[in-house]
């Protein structure tokens, strides 16, 4: 059992690591912004639209949620101002107090709620429908999945009324996993602690109370289902993972899984299908590893990514680079991996920093990372949120992924372990 002293020591280490990270930020990043939210957000996702502000800035939007103590929770659509590619980056503009770099000043770096929607309980996860980004699904501490059209809500709620567009019924417990079908509008999957995956078509007729029963309920896991994801290229295929340490691959037309794999040595918390390759997917686990799989031969994992120091709760592929994958979790770190570097020769000194496929470690958080999202419009830009209310928008220095600058001092770009 952890003692108070252990916690204090852990906090001290985290604080020291953060100071080192902050000192090296101008050398490791082209862009960093740190913002303290009013309440922690367990979920984050960039919306796909971008608006032009002026010659040097564009306005992006984020889907966030709140996790309050006893106050009203909200689903948030927030806007953020970001410098354009042709904005002049100046190292002298780095703000050590705010840990901001890359053109963000005290005004430009604000994250401001644009629309605030009443939500029943904290927002465990929120994701927009790819075909209509104004339609957002959320998971909460309650069993139902909620659907909102944020265009039908004012900037600030008029009262405390909770008014989702649709309530999706079918689960008996809460959960986190949520996935919209990228190829068929309106189809959505949800994973739950009740050991099932539910499937709905939100275009189907709902009852007078605005409720819609699940089209299908998939039962194959023997414990909590942690995550679910549609295949990106095959519209009827999806995967699920759970606390039974298994990866299940399903066809939506069949009630039993086509594949059932013992994927990890501990609970499997997340999965993601590669958007470029129809055969490749990744899973993240409490065993501190990310596993790479080929659907053509699931008997053996292709590779195990090992560098995290604690449970992994989120894994996502870059929308711009086929070989780039990121993972995050309890160790307060977000790791960016490059599959093309697997098996490359390393010096003993480099090996101490991690395997060759470990491209970058984002060390800006001092608490568990709850969620992160790749920006769909700006390559290499990531937004990550942690349990201590912190939201960070960041982009690693281009010499790290372009390998242009061989002269950068090793002590400066040393990965934060």
UniProtKB/Swiss-Prot annotation:
- Repeat region (WD), residues: 118-158, 170-210, 220-260, 263-303, 307-347, 364-404
Q: Which UniProt keywords apply?
A: Centromere, Chromatin regulator, Chromosome, Developmental protein, Nucleus, Repeat, Repressor, Transcription, Transcription regulation, WD repeat
* Stored Pfam families: CAF1C_H4-bd (PF12265), WD40 (PF00400)
Q: Does the keyword Transcription regulation apply?
A: yes
- Write down the InterPro entries for this protein, in alphabetical order: G-protein_beta_WD-40_rep (IPR020472), Histone-bd_RBBP4-like_N (IPR022052), WD40/YVTN_repeat-like_dom_sf (IPR015943), WD40_repeat_CS (IPR019775), WD40_repeat_dom_sf (IPR036322), WD40_rpt (IPR001680), WD_repeat_RBAP46/RBAP48/MSI1 (IPR050459)
Q: Does the record's keyword annotation contain Transcription regulation?
A: yes
Biological processes, Gene Ontology terms: cell fate specification; chromatin organization; chromatin remodeling; embryo development ending in birth or egg hatching; embryonic digestive tract morphogenesis; mitochondrial unfolded protein response; negative regulation of DNA-templated transcription; negative regulation of vulval development
Loss of function: phenotype: Decreased protein levels of DRM complex components including lin-9, lin-37, lin-52 and lin-54. Double knockout with the programmed cell death regulator mcd-1 results slow larval growth. RNAi-mediated knockdown results in embryonic lethality. RNAi-mediated knockdown leads to a reduction of hcp-3 and his-1 protein levels and to a depletion of hcp-3 on centromeres and a reduction of H3K27me3 levels on metaphase chromosomes. RNAi-mediated knockdown results in chromosome segregation defects during mitosis.
Where can this protein be found?
A: Nucleus; Chromosome, Centromere
Entry's Gene Ontology molecular function annotations: histone binding; histone deacetylase binding
One cellular component term (GO) for this entry is: chromosome, centromeric region
Where, by residue number, does the polypeptide cross the bilayer?
none
Which pairs are disulfide-linked? none
Tell me which domain of life the UniProt entry assigns to the organism this sequence originates from. Answer: Eukaryota
Summary of subunit composition and partner proteins: Binds directly to helix 1 of the histone fold of histone H4, a region that is not accessible when H4 is in chromatin. Probable component of a NuRD-like complex, composed of at least lin-53 and hda-1. Interacts with lin-35. Interacts with hda-1; the interaction is direct. Component of the DRM complex, at least composed of lin-9, lin-35, lin-37, lin-52, lin-53, lin-54- dpl-1 and efl-1. Interacts with hcp-3.
Q: What does this protein do?
A: Core histone-binding subunit that may target chromatin assembly factors, chromatin remodeling factors and histone deacetylases to their histone substrates in a manner that is regulated by nucleosomal DNA. Required for hcp-3 and his-1 stabilization, localization of hcp-3 to centromeres and for proper chromosome segregation. Synthetic multivulva class B (synMuvB) protein. SynMuvB proteins are required to repress the induction of vulval development by Ras signaling and probably act by forming the multiprotein DRM complex that represses transcription.
Similarity-based family: Belongs to the WD repeat RBAP46/RBAP48/MSI1 family.
What is the protein named? Probable histone-binding protein lin-53
């Amino acid at each position: 059992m952890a003692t108070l002293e252990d916690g204090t020591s852990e906090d001290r280490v985290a604080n020291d690591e953060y100071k080192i990270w902050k000192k090296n930020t101008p050398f490791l990043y082209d862009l960093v912004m740190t913002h303290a939210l009013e309440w922690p957000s367990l979920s984050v996702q960039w919306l796909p639209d971008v608006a032009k502000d002026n010659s040097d800035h564009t306005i992006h939007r984020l889907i966030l949620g709140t996790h309050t103590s006893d106050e009203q929770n909200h689903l948030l659509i927030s806007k953020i101002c970001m410098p354009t590619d042709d904005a002049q980056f100046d190292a002298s503009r780095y703000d050590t107090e705010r840990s901001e770099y890359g053109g963000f000043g005290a005004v430009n770096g604000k994250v401001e709620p644009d629309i605030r929607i009443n939500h029943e309980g904290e927002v465990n996860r929120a994701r927009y429908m790819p075909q209509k980004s104004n339609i957002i699904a959320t998971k909460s501490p309650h069993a139902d999945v909620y659907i909102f059209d944020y265009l039908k809500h004012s900037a600030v709620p008029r009262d405390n009324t909770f008014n989702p567009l649709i309530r999706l019924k079918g689960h008996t417990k809460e959960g986190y996993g949520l996935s919209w079908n990228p190829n068929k509008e309106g189809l959505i999957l949800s994973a739950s602690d009740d050991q099932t995956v539910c499937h709905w078509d939100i275009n189907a007729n709902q009852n007078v109370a605005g409720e819609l029963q699940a089209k299908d309920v998939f039962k194959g896991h023997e414990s909590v289902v942690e995550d679910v994801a549609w295949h990106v290229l095959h519209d009827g295929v999806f995967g699920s993972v759970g606390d039974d340490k298994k990866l299940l691959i399903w066809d939506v037309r069949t009630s039993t899984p086509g594949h059932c794999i013992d994927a990890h040595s501990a609970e499997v918390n997340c999965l993601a299908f590669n958007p470029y390759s129809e055969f490749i997917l990744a899973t993240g686990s409490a065993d501190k590893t990310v596993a790479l799989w080929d659907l053509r031969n699931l008997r053996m994992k292709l590779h195990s990514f090992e560098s995290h120091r604690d449970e992994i709760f989120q894994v996502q592929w870059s929308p711009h680079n086929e070989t780039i994958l990121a993972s995050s979790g309890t160790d307060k770190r977000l790791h960016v991996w490059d599959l093309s570097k697997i098996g490359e020769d390393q010096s003993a000194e480099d090996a101490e920093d991690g395997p060759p496929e470990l491209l970058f470690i984002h060390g800006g958080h001092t608490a568990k990372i709850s969620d992160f999202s790749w920006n769909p419009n700006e390559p290499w830009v990531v937004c990550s949120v942690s349990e201590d209310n912190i939201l960070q928008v960041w982009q690693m220095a281009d010499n790290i992924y372009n390998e242009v600058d061989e002269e950068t001092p090793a002590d400066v770009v040393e990965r934060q372990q």
